[in-house]
């Protein structure tokens, strides 16, 4: 029912399925070890993965969910949920601050780049450290073209990409890649592979960009065009504390959802991935984070693809949030990375036996309307 505040509505969910807790949980005294987490986009798949990872912590944290979508939030796994304004509204932060005060929140986990940006820009309003990378880091990483130029200037491997100032620029950009055959066209901002596809000639690129301009309102100048990387796809997620990498895990993406529905054969959503040991990939990612910020704190996720001759190059970085589709794998490794993050954010640094990730092979299998499943390599043929 309405709380009396104009921007927020409180929903007390019953403990059912994966949920837990009662109203009495909110009256318990707060100790130094308690984690009281607010998870945004509650009810989404990304938030569900985060909440399941948080529930694996002992003692289990108190978990509050928030979402502006009153339908999606009905699927939330949190103990208590709030309907809040959209993150892009001026009332969003007021609502979050109200929840922080009401429920003694000491940890906020944003599950998308919009929330990471809003929290980053208003961090001084919060009564505790939001455990985010610097504002400048988040801004740089949310502009893929600016990040690409930043790394090129510092000798960190990235694909060659160029801004599309106008459709007339396309001929000149293609001329720079004469003989390469396939280029990668994408929007410089946004998530979920927005505006991204492979193109083989100027006409394809022009038609693709014009379609997004006319139907989705994305400006031509928001597109980039450059080197297509056909090799293996990696992500490296790491948690940092004052310039020290507490834990980093390398994951290889093996296959994707709905690859038959787009010409590139890839997407931003893996349905099969695995933990790997890739020293060169890890080194590049750690060097990249240190180049951006010499005293980083929080979570940073780096994506890479290999060139035709097998050299990894950074395609983008998501700073201040966990990747939506591999969180379950990060939590299922011998050291739960979400626990490392939550404890560091609330003042406790864990002892981690394998700070550069597990050497054991774990596979993450995901599909629509199915809970994600993690399987060790040794168990792949069990029961078959």
Which residues fall in each region the model found?
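Active-site nucleotide/adenylate-binding loops and adjacent lid/helix of ATP-dependent enzymes
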Residues: 2, 138-223, 230, 242-243, ...
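ATP-binding N-terminal substructure of ATP-dependent carboxylate-amine bond-forming enzymes
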Residues: 1-133, 168-171
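ATP-dependent carboxylate/phosphate-activation module, predominantly the ATP-grasp catalytic core
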Residues: 203, 207, 226-233, 237-294, ...
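Short, charged, surface-exposed secondary-structure boundary motifs
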Residues: 74-76, 92-94, 139-145, 193, ...
């Amino acid at each position: 029912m309405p709380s009396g505040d104009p921007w927020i509505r409180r929903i007390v969910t019953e403990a059912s399925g994966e949920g837990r807790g009662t109203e009495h949980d909110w009256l318990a005294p707060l100790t130094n070890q308690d984690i009281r987490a607010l998870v945004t986009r509650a009810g989404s798949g990304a938030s569900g993965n985060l909440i399941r990872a948080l529930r694996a912590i002992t003692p289990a944290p108190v978990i509050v969910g928030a979402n502006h979508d009153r339908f999606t939030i009905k699927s939330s796994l949190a103990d208590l949920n709030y309907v809040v304004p959209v993150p892009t509204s001026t009332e969003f932060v007021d609502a979050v601050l109200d929840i922080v005060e009401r429920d003694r929140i000491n940890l906020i986990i944003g599950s998308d780049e919009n929330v990471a940006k809003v929290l980053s820009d208003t961090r001084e309003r919060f009564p505790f450290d939001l455990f985010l990378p610097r504002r400048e880091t988040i801004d740089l990483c949310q502009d893929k073209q600016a990040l690409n130029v930043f790394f090129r200037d510092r000798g960190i491997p990235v694909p060659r990409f160029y801004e599309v100032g106008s459709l007339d620029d396309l001929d000149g950009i293609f001329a720079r890649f004469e003989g390469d055959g396939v280029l990668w066209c994408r929007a410089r901002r946004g998530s979920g592979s927005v505006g991204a596809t492979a193109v083989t000639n100027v006409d394809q690129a022009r038609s693709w960009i014009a379609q997004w301009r006319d139907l989705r309102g994305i400006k031509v100048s928001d597109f980039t065009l450059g080197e297509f990387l056909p090799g293996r796809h990696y992500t490296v997620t790491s948690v940092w504390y004052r310039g020290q990498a507490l834990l980093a895990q390398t994951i290889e993406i093996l296959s994707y959802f709905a690859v038959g529905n787009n010409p590139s054969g890839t997407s931003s959503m893996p349905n099969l991935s695995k933990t790997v040991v890739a020293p060169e990939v890890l080194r590049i990612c750690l060097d990249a984070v240190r180049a951006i910020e010499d005293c980083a704190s929080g979570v940073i996720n780096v994506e890479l693809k290999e060139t035709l001759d097998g050299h990894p190059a950074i395609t983008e970085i998501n700073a201040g949030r966990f990747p939506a589709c591999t969180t379950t794998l990060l939590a299922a490794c011998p050291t739960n990375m979400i626990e490392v993050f939550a404890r560091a954010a609330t003042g406790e640094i864990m002892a981690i036996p394998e700070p550069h990730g597990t050497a054991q092979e774990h596979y993450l299998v995901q599909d629509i309307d199915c809970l994600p499943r993690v399987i060790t390599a040794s168990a792949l043929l069990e029961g078959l």
